[in-house]
From Swiss-Prot:
Domain of life: Bacteria
Binding site for ATP: S235, G236, G237, V238, D239, S240, S241
Domain GMPS ATP-PPase: residue ranges: 208-400
Reactions that this protein is recorded to catalyse: XMP + L-glutamine + ATP + H2O = GMP + L-glutamate + AMP + diphosphate + 2 H(+)
Alphabetized CDD domains for the sequence: GATase1_GMP_Synthase, GMP_synthase_C
Pathway: Purine metabolism; GMP biosynthesis; GMP from XMP (L-Gln route): step 1/1
Organism whose genome encodes this protein: Pseudomonas entomophila (strain L48)
Keywords: ATP-binding, Glutamine amidotransferase, GMP biosynthesis, Ligase, Nucleotide-binding, Purine biosynthesis
Molecular-function GO terms, alphabetical: ATP binding; GMP synthase activity
Active site positions: C86 (nucleophile), H181, E183
Gene (name only): guaA
One Pfam family here: GATase
The name this protein goes by in its record: GMP synthase [glutamine-hydrolyzing]
CC terms in the record's Gene Ontology section: cytosol
């Protein structure tokens, strides 16, 4: 009998915290399947989900405000372990008969909590032991309200001078609350705390591994698709590449990929995609060379948003044209990943509860009467990368920096021309090549060159040069919501600048972008 890697599962209820997806990723890293749902999930849906344990996440609300979020009653009726984090601890306390009050002293940032209770959750987990034998943890706090009276048979788990009940527990029920955030890396023992809850207290086995996920996904694809044929738009990005490798492993020649070469890709990228999938892996790939069509449609347009729309529409037109030549296609594959699913799934409070498909190929599924196959829809980006490696894709492809859908079209400021794209491609290639040589590529989260449609005077030999300006951009980030400009060594910048100006006829000046996000965005357009 096939292994059910979803059998041991954790339910995470989202109360609006910026860290909620991080909790899910941490639980998955432990090797346990979990799902993230809105706090107002139906009682019946919770019972049907049948979790081994439940995590109540944090949120920005105050429990004593009218209509503030509450955990569904099913959470406490199921008799499974529950971990409340921050707001989750407060609503647990309030709903079970305790008391929560506003605090004059809010806690945001690093804190040290004393572990004062002997619980299963924190037994043997500490960062410090003081002279009196009191255990301490270095944690990350982010709260205003605090629990001032615990419900029922709860005991104090942890405390700080300003928050005497910074944690509470009832080992008999398997209920725990912590006012700090174990899911963020600033809480040093956070991984051990979550592992203790998920594995030891909830009894979940680590079945959620890359090899098991691949086997499970292959089995699901085969069951869904049968002997039918599947179409995939292959971009060369991480998600579509992993989908292609996975589907090829599952159904072989039943898969046909269409790779649209829009003339706005990185240097040699089209050839690399074809070599990887068609020549090395034996995948059926149709290459549509549509550079002229894209550039013709972009001619004269300088507005960034309009450029994006033109590129998107043209992609759909080209993809449609290629797809219409194929016969007997029943399924369209897409690289939808779990964050897409979370974003498009709402709560019942006026938001759509139905998960919408991200139709990155427009209305094609409806027009061609195709059914969707989305083998990555349960996976976070880091998990997609891991199964990419498991499927044999090269590390450099799987861990490549993000590249925008419109490609170089949004890295050429203003109107897009073939001349600009050709210059930019070469400059970008030099920058990335030198980052790799200096071992800086994987220290940066994203790095690229931007073409600026302005000219600057330069000197080459004894002659005057009047040529284009490009900007180097490199950032470090964890989540791409905020980013710091990368502090690259001056020697590296000097090498890159020298090579670009000397090797590319048409560039006279190289600048380095030292803007962080916010206030700037990572991409220029």
């Amino acid at each position: 009998m096939a292994l059910d890697i979803h059998a041991h599962r954790i339910l995470i209820l989202d109360f609006g915290s910026q860290y909620t997806q991080l909790i899910a990723r941490r639980v998955r890293e432990i090797g346990v399947y979990c799902e993230l749902h809105p706090f107002d999930m139906d009682d019946e849906a919770i019972r049907e989900f049948n979790p081994r344990g439940i995590i109540l996440a944090g949120g920005p609300e105050s429990v004593h405000e009218a209509n503030s979020p509450r955990a569904p009653q099913a959470v406490f009726d199921l008799k499974v372990p529950v971990l409340g984090i921050c707001y989750g601890m407060q609503t647990m306390a309030e709903q079970m008969g305790g008391k929560v009050e506003g605090s004059d002293l809010r806690e945001f940032g690093y804190a040290r909590v004393d572990v004062v209770g002997k619980s299963r959750l924190l037994d043997g987990i500490e960062d410090h032991v003081d002279d009196d034998g009191v255990l301490g943890l270095d944690v990350w706090m982010s709260h205003g309200d605090k629990v001032t009276q615990m419900p029922g048979n709860f005991s104090v788990l942890a405390s700080t001078p300003s928050c005497p009940i910074a944690g509470m527990y009832d080992d008999a029920l398997g209920y725990y609350g912590v006012q700090f955030h174990p899911e963020v890396t600033h809480t040093k023992q956070g991984g051990r705390i979550l592992s203790r809850f998920v594995q030891d207290i909830c009894g979940c086995e680590a079945l959620w591994t890359a090899s098991n996920i691949v086997e499970d996904a292959i089995a699901q694809v085969r069951a869904q698709v049968g002997s039918a044929n599947v179409l995939l738009g292959l971009s060369g990005g991480v998600d579509s590449s992993v989908v292609a490798a996975l589907l090829h492993r599952a159904i072989g020649d039943q898969l046909t990929c269409v790779f649209v070469d829009n003339g706005l890709l990185r240097l040699h990228e089209g050839d690399q995609v074809m070599a990887m999938f068609k020549e090395n892996m034996g995948v059926k790939v149709i290459r549509a060379d549509a550079e002229k069509q894209f550039l013709d449609n972009l001619e004269g347009e300088a507005d960034p948003e309009k450029k994006r729309k033109i590129i998107g529409r043209t992609f759909i037109d080209v993809f449609d044209a290629e797809a219409s030549k194929l016969e007997n296609i029943q399924f369209l594959a897409q690289g939808t990943i779990y964050p897409d699913v979370i974003e498009s799934a709402g709560a019942k409070s006026g938001k759509a509860h139905v998960i919408k498909s991200h139709h990155n190929v427009g209305g094609l599924p409806e027009e061609m009467n195709l059914k969707l196959v989305e083998p990555l829809r349960e996976l976070f980006k880091d998990e997609v990368r891991k199964i990419g490696l498991e499927l044999g894709l090269p590390y450099d492809m799987v861990y490549r920096h993000p590249f925008p859908g419109p490609g170089l079209g949004v890295r050429i400021l203003g109107e897009v021309k073939k001349e600009y794209a050709d210059i930019l491609r070469r400059a970008d290639h030099i920058f990335i090549e030198e980052l790799r040589k200096a071992d800086w590529y994987h220290k940066t989260s994203q790095a690229f060159v931007v073409f600026q449609p302005v000219k600057s005077v330069g000197v080459v030999g004894d002659g005057r040069r009047y040529a284009w300006v490009v900007a180097l951009r490199a950032v470090e980030t964890v989540d791409f919501m905020t980013a710091r400009w990368a502090h690259l060594p001056y020697e590296l910048l000097e090498t890159v600048s020298g090579r670009i100006i000397n090797e590319i006829d048409g560039i006279s000046r190289v600048t380095y972008d030292v803007s962080s996000k916010p206030p700037a965005t990572i991409e220029w357009e």
